[in-house]
C-alpha cells in the first residue's frame, strides 16, 4: 500500500511538472509571437515610408526627399556628382529636432567643399496630392574631403518642429564652393 501511494504521488508530481513546463513554453511562445508582431509592424511602417520617399523623389525635379521613418538613403545627382544621403541620429531637443545629415560621395574622388539648402517641414495629404506645410530652410556648408570615397556628416538643428511633426527633409542646390 505504501508503494501504491508513493507511485500515485510520483505520478501526480510528474503531471504537475509537465503542466508547469507546458505553461512556461506557452508563455515563451506568446512572448515570441508578440515580439514578432511588433517587429512586423515596424517593418510595415518603414516599408510605407520607403515607398512614400521613393514616390516623392520620382516626382521631384529639384533635390532629394528624405523621410525620417524610411531609415533608408536616397541618391541625388548634383553638380559635385552622385551623392547618397540619409538621416541618422534623429532626436528631440528643447527647440525642436536635431539630426545628422550623412552625405556620401559615390565616386572614387574626394568631395570638394560644397554648399546646399535643406528644407524641412510637414507633409499634408497623400503622396499623389500632397502639400508641404510649415516649411523652413537653412543653408549648409561642408569642407572639402581628403579621403575617397567621402562621407560627410552635417549636424542639423531643425527649430520649431518636433520629431513627431517632422514629415520630410529635402536637400537641393548642392554646389561646389571655391576655397
Curated annotation (Swiss-Prot):
Gene3D superfamilies: Lipoprotein YajI-like. The keyword Transcription regulation does not apply. It is found in: Cell membrane. It is a lipid-anchor. A lipid is attached at residue 20 (N-palmitoyl cysteine). A lipid is attached at residue 20 (S-diacylglycerol cysteine). GO terms for cellular component: plasma membrane. InterPro entries: DUF3251, YajI-like_sf. Residues 1-19 form the signal peptide. It comes from the Bacteria. Keywords: Cell membrane, Lipoprotein, Membrane, Palmitate, Signal. Its main location: membrane. It holds the Pfam family DUF3251. Coiled coil: none annotated. This is Uncharacterized lipoprotein YajI. It comes from Escherichia coli (strain K12).
Amino acid at each position: 500500500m505504501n508503494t501504491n501511494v508513493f507511485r500515485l504521488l510520483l505520478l501526480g508530481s510528474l503531471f504537475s511538472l509537465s503542466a508547469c513546463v507546458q505553461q512556461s513554453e506557452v508563455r515563451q511562445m506568446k512572448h515570441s509571437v508578440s515580439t514578432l508582431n511588433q517587429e512586423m509592424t515596424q517593418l510595415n511602417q518603414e516599408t510605407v515610408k520607403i515607398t512614400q520617399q521613393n514616390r516623392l523623389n520620382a516626382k521631384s525635379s529639384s533635390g532629394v526627399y528624405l523621410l525620417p521613418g524610411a531609415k533608408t538613403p536616397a541618391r541625388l545627382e548634383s553638380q559635385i556628382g552622385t551623392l547618397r544621403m540619409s538621416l541618422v541620429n534623429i532626436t528631440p531637443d528643447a527647440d525642436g529636432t536635431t539630426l545628422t545629415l550623412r552625405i556620401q560621395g559615390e565616386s572614387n574622388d574626394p568631395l570638394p567643399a560644397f554648399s546646399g539648402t535643406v528644407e524641412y517641414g510637414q507633409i499634408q495629404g497623400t503622396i499623389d496630392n500632397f502639400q508641404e506645410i510649415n516649411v523652413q530652410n537653412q543653408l549648409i556648408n561642408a569642407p572639402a574631403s581628403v579621403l575617397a570615397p567621402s562621407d560627410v556628416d552635417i549636424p542639423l538643428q531643425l527649430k520649431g518642429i518636433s520629431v513627431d511633426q517632422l514629415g520630410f527633409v529635402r536637400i537641393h542646390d548642392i554646389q561646389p564652393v571655391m576655397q
